[in-house]
Amino acid sequence: MCTSGQIIGSLLVLSVLEIGLGVSSVAVGAVSFSLALREHKPQLGDSSPVWSGVCFLLCGICGILCAKKKSGLVMILFSACCICGLIGGILNFQFLRAVTKKTSSLYPLHLASMSLACIGIGGCTLSSWLTCRLASYEQRRMFSEREHSLHHSHEMAEKEITDNMSNGGPQLIFNGRV
């Protein structure tokens, strides 16, 4: 069983990886798109690395935010960003696969973009899984704290009743005892 610290550490590493992939994908996509504009009329997949890079970048930023603030809303936001990153990466790969020709001068850039998309898809998948683990851990922790708090307040109520009985206060019957 992983501890919360291990999950958060892994989430931070994956988030930094996603930010790096996002920046790299945007850079490769921008170069690829500018070269595609010079060579031929732009096609649908020429700018897809930029958009998937933006999705990966947002996923990484939200992952760091999620690791710092472990609230439910931030975890939901991060999960949504991971899903957007998955969709962006898959669409990027599909568009580039349709556009890429091995004889094209853009082939190495398209291959690099597809590789970045595959790594980004894997990172988003792992990040989603880690977020679910973190949410489960936080839910158990909050339940345990609430249970401890209720037990503590029950003990305090019993103590108050016994103090009143020993101080000559009104006698109360509690669980069949005077």
UniProtKB/Swiss-Prot annotation:
<dbReference type="GO" id="GO:0008285">
    <property type="term" value="P:negative regulation of cell population proliferation"/>
</dbReference>
<dbReference type="GO" id="GO:0005737">
    <property type="term" value="C:cytoplasm"/>
</dbReference>
<keyword id="KW-0043">Tumor suppressor</keyword>
<protein>
    <recommendedName>
        <fullName>Transmembrane protein 196</fullName>
    </recommendedName>
</protein>
<dbReference type="GO" id="GO:0030308">
    <property type="term" value="P:negative regulation of cell growth"/>
</dbReference>
<dbReference type="InterPro" id="IPR037661">
    <property type="entry name" value="TMEM196"/>
</dbReference>
<keyword id="KW-1133">Transmembrane helix</keyword>
<feature type="transmembrane region" description="Helical">
    <location>
        <begin position="106"/>
        <end position="126"/>
    </location>
</feature>
<dbReference type="GO" id="GO:0043065">
    <property type="term" value="P:positive regulation of apoptotic process"/>
</dbReference>
<keyword id="KW-0963">Cytoplasm</keyword>
<feature type="transmembrane region" description="Helical">
    <location>
        <begin position="73"/>
        <end position="93"/>
    </location>
</feature>
<dbReference type="GO" id="GO:0030336">
    <property type="term" value="P:negative regulation of cell migration"/>
</dbReference>
<feature type="transmembrane region" description="Helical">
    <location>
        <begin position="11"/>
        <end position="31"/>
    </location>
</feature>
<feature type="transmembrane region" description="Helical">
    <location>
        <begin position="47"/>
        <end position="67"/>
    </location>
</feature>
<dbReference type="GO" id="GO:0090090">
    <property type="term" value="P:negative regulation of canonical Wnt signaling pathway"/>
</dbReference>
<keyword id="KW-0812">Transmembrane</keyword>
<dbReference type="GO" id="GO:0016020">
    <property type="term" value="C:membrane"/>
</dbReference>
<keyword id="KW-0472">Membrane</keyword>
<comment type="function">
    <text>Acts as a tumor suppressor in lung cancer. Inhibits tumor cell growth by inhibiting cell proliferation and migration and promoting cell apoptosis. Inhibits metastasis of lung cancer by suppressing beta-catenin expression in the Wnt/beta-catenin signaling pathway.</text>
</comment>
